Amino acid sequence: MMRKWLKKNRLEKGFTQEEVAKAAQIGRAYYTMIENGTRKPSVIVSKKIGEKLGFDWTIFFEDVCNETKHNSKDSA
């Protein structure tokens, strides 16, 4: 499942995929796979992405990491 919330968050903060990938110490292609939902990041990578983009990294490991739940936090 594509993580549209992740892309939206990155774009709102004004970062490129390359910048986030560099902060997470991974390649841009791997970050793209995380953003597209084809790869799940490790705990270490999740923490670095969360730190760079300013969100709780544990969202990557929730049973249902869906956009409705994430977006409900934005609209509250």
UniProtKB/Swiss-Prot annotation:
A matching Pfam family: HTH_3
InterPro entries: Cro/C1-type_HTH, Lambda_DNA-bd_dom_sf
One MF annotation (Gene Ontology) recorded for this entry: DNA binding
Keywords carried by this UniProt record: DNA-binding, Transcription, Transcription regulation
Matches recorded under CDD domains: HTH_XRE
Ranges where the HTH cro/C1-type domain occurs: 6-60
Superkingdom in the source lineage: Bacteria
SMART domains: HTH_XRE
Protein name: Uncharacterized HTH-type transcriptional regulator YqaF
Organism, as annotated: Bacillus subtilis (strain 168)
